[in-house]
Design a protein with these regions (language model features):
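Short, Lys/Arg-rich cytosolic juxtamembrane segment immediately N-terminal
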Residues: 26-38
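Short stretches within intrinsically disordered, low-complexity N-terminal or propeptide regions
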Residues: 19-21, 34, 48, 62
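Non-catalytic cap/lid and distal C-terminal segments of serine-dependent acyl enzymes
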Residues: 2-16, 39-46, 53-355
C-alpha cells in the first residue's frame, strides 16, 4: 500500500485558492484562469479591431466570447472556501491526475475538526488516489453533524448556526466545483463511523449526483434498541451537541436518516460496506493506561458497528439489493483500519466513476 503523503502549504482566499509561492499557472498545481479579466480583455480587443470607415455598410457586432471555465490543473492540492447557508466552508481538494471530471467525496468522523479533514492527515488517502483521474473532495468541519440538515441549532452548546450539511454537499458544493470542471453527476461518496450512514443516505436520496457509496464502520441500524440514546451520548461527548436539535425522536427527519428505512432507495447503486468485529488487530499497539483505554473504547464502538452492519446486510438481502460487504477478521474503530478498507474499496469506486 502507498506510504503517507506529505502535506503541502497552501495560500487560500474565498472562492478559490492560489498556488504555493513559486508555482505558476499551467503547472501541475497552478491556479484556475482569471475568468473576468480574460473576458474584459477579449471584449476590449474585439472593439479595437472593428473596421470603422465612412460609408461602410452596417456591421453586426459579434457576440463576446464566453468566459472560460475555471478549470483546476491536472493534479495538485488546493484548499477552497465555499459559500454556504452555514457560512464559508473550507474544502480540501486533490485534483484529478489528468483533469478528469469524476470526484470522490471523503466525509469525516464524529470528531471532525475545523482546520483539516482527517482523511488528509490520518491516512494516506491522497497518495492512494494521486495517480488516478478522480478528484478527492474533503469537506472540513461538521462535528457531530451526521452531515444532515438539522431542524435547529444545538441548544446544549450555544451553537449559533443550524447545520445544513446535506444541502451543502448536494447543492452548494457541487455547483461550486462545477466551475472547476468537476461533474455534478459523476461522483462517489465514502464515510466512516458517523459519516458511514450519511454517505449511504446522500447516495440513496441524490442518485443523480452519486454513482457509488461506501460505509466503513458505520452504525447502520438506527431502530435498534437504545441506538438513539447511544447516538445522544456520542454527540454530547463530541462537542456537547443535542441529538434532538438534529431531529425529533421518530420524526420524518429522523427516519429519513435511518439506513434501514431508506434501504429500498439503494437498489442498483454499487456499494462497498465494511466493519471489523472489534477484536484488536495489527494496528492496535496501546501504550500505557491511556492507550489501553482508547483501544478498549475503539473495540466497543467497532463491535456495535459490526452488529448493525450485519443487520443492514440482512435488510438488503431481504430486499434483493446487491452490495459488496467486507468483514475483516480483526480490527477496531480507528483510522489505520479505515485506510486499509479505502484501499479495498478503491477499484470499485474507480470502476463506477469510469476513472
Amino acid at each position: 500500500m502507498p506510504q503517507q503523503q506529505k502535506e503541502s502549504g497552501i495560500h487560500m482566499r474565498f472562492g478559490k485558492a492560489t498556488a504555493p509561492k513559486g508555482e505558476q499557472p499551467g503547472t501541475s498545481r497552478g491556479v484556475a484562469p482569471r475568468g473576468w479579466r480574460n473576458r474584459i480583455l477579449a471584449v476590449g480587443a474585439a472593439a479595437l479591431v472593428l473596421p470603422i470607415a465612412a460609408g461602410a455598410a452596417p456591421m453586426a457586432f459579434a457576440a463576446p466570447a464566453p468566459a472560460p471555465v475555471l478549470r483546476a490543473p491536472a493534479g495538485g492540492y488546493e484548499e477552497l472556501m465555499v459559500p454556504s447557508k452555514m457560512g464559508p466552508v473550507k474544502v480540501q481538494v486533490q485534483w484529478a491526475r489528468n483533469g478528469g471530471n469524476a470526484a470522490l467525496y471523503l466525509l469525516d468522523g464524529l470528531r471532525a475538526r475545523d482546520d483539516r479533514n482527517a482523511w488528509s492527515f490520518e491516512t494516506n488517502a491522497m497518495q492512494q488516489f494521486s495517480n488516478d483521474n478522480v478528484t478527492l473532495v474533503m469537506p472540513v468541519g461538521g462535528q457531530s453533524s451526521w452531515y444532515a440538515d438539522w431542524t435547529a441549532a444545538s441548544n446544549t452548546n450555544g451553537q449559533k448556526t443550524t447545520y445544513k450539511w446535506e444541502s451543502f454537499l448536494t447543492e452548494e458544493l457541487p455547483a461550486f466545483l462545477e466551475g472547476y470542471g468537476v461533474s455534478r453527476t459523476n461522483n462517489a461518496v465514502l464515510g466512516l463511523s458517523m459519516s458511514g450512514p450519511a454517505a449511504l443516505r446522500l447516495a440513496a436520496l441524490h442518485r443523480n449526483q452519486f454513482k457509488h457509496a461506501s460505509s466503513l464502520s458505520g452504525p447502520l441500524n438506527w431502530g435498534a434498541p437504545g441506538m438513539r440514546e447511544a447516538i445522544r451520548v456520542m454527540m454530547l461527548d463530541a462537542g456537547r451537541f443535542n441529538v434532538d436539535s438534529m431531529a425529533a425522536p421518530w420524526s420524518p427527519a429522523w427516519l429519513r436518516m435511518d439506513p434501514m428505512v431508506f434501504a429500498p432507495e439503494l437498489r442498483g447503486l454499487p456499494m462497498f460496506i465494511s466493519s471489523a468485529n472489534g477484536l484488536p488487530g495489527q494496528h492496535d499497539r496501546p501504550a500505557g493506561l491511556g492507550g489501553m483505554y482508547n483501544t478498549a473504547n475503539a473495540m466497543g464502538i467497532e463491535a456495535i458497528s459490526f452488529v448493525s452492519t450485519l443487520a443492514f446486510q440482512s435488510r438488503l438481502k431481504s430486499l434483493g439489493i446487491a452490495a459488496t460487504f467486507d468483514f475483516p477478521a480483526n480490527g477496531t474503530h480507528s483510522w489505520k483500519y479505515w485506510e486499509d478498507q479505502l484501499w479495498k474499496a478503491r477499484p470499485q469506486i474507480l470502476g463506477a466513476l469510469g476513472a
